[in-house]
Regions:
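Amphipathic alpha-helical linker/stalk segments
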Residues: 71-99, 129-132, 137-139, 154
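Short alpha-helical functional segments enriched in proximate histidine and acidic residues
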Residues: 32, 86, 107, 157, ...
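Hydrophobic alpha-helical connector segments
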Residues: 70, 84-114, 146, 172, ...
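N-terminal intrinsically disordered/low-complexity leader segments
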Residues: 1-20, 31
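Short hydrophobic clusters on alpha-helical segments that form packing/core surfaces
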Residues: 25-33, 75, 79, 104
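Hydrophobic/aromatic-rich alpha-helical bundle segments in the mid-to-C-terminal region
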Residues: 115-116, 130-131, 136-144, 151, ...
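Short coil/turn segments at alpha/beta junctions that flank glycine-rich nucleotide-binding fingerprints
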Residues: 35-39, 90, 111, 164
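Helix-turn-helix
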Residues: 24, 28, 32-66, 70
Length: 218
């Protein structure tokens, strides 16, 4: 019987396939974090799901927290793409804020697994949870900074709205938190209660946005 190649025996991909292996690891980690919870999931369980040895995982991630942060930043990165489209196509400051909320809601409902992982429960490592959206954004490549980058874009939109002459009831960061809390509540409820007989999802999203905007404007 021919001997297994070193790459197969070690669980390594051939040269040039490392990115594929990294994505396989992240997919396995995401599935297990959702199925068993972040705290209960072990490196060995992730390695078994991928079909490699535990040491092979350390070629890509130094620990479980690094995997979770990569999943968070991957998710936020996709959301940021939608926000960037808004910034490039919507000129009215108030409409930008509305579009932000709409894009956020649609993203969450289109990607319920990712949303549950990142926003619902206690999956986020404590090192990031402590600072949350107030993490410094001077280095956009810092692991776990994705959420803060998304929040900063909303703060910027609200600052632009204020600069256009619209008066806000509260400081911009407080208004941003209120907007996020409102739309997050709608999205989280719909994701966690998919069987609930919601009246009309589109109206609920629009209605919450109307309530939020009336609340933050003077």
């Amino acid at each position: 019987m021919p001997a297994l190649s070193t790459a197969v025996a070690s669980g390594r991909k051939k040269r040039g396939e490392g990115h594929t292996r990294r994505e396989e690891i992240l997919q396995a980690a995401k599935e297990l974090f959702l199925e068993e919870g972040y705290d209960a999931t072990t490196i060995r369980r992730i390695a078994d799901r991928v079909g490699v040895s535990a040491p092979a995982l350390y070629l890509y991630f130094h620990d479980k927290e690094a995997m979770m942060l990569a999943l968070c930043d991957q998710t936020f990165g996709r959301l940021i793409e939608r926000i960037t489209d808004i910034e490039n196509t919507v000129s009215d400051p108030l409409e930008r804020v509305r579009h932000f909320g709409d894009a956020y809601a649609r993203f969450g409902l289109e990607h319920p697994d990712e949303y549950r992982l990142v926003f619902i429960g206690n999956n986020i490592p404590e090192s990031v949870r402590k600072v949350g959206h107030r993490m410094p954004i001077d280095d956009p490549t810092r692991p776990g900074v994705g959420g803060a980058l998304v929040f900063s874009r909303l703060v910027t939109m609200l600052s632009q709205l204020e600069a256009s002459g619209v008066k806000l009831n509260y400081p911009t960061d407080t208004c941003a938190e209120l907007c996020w809390m409102g739309i997050h509540g709608v999205v989280a409820a719909m994701i966690m209660k998919p069987e609930f007989p919601w009246s009309n999802r589109e109206m609920l999203i629009k209605g919450m946005q109307d309530i939020m905007i009336r609340g933050i404007l003077k």
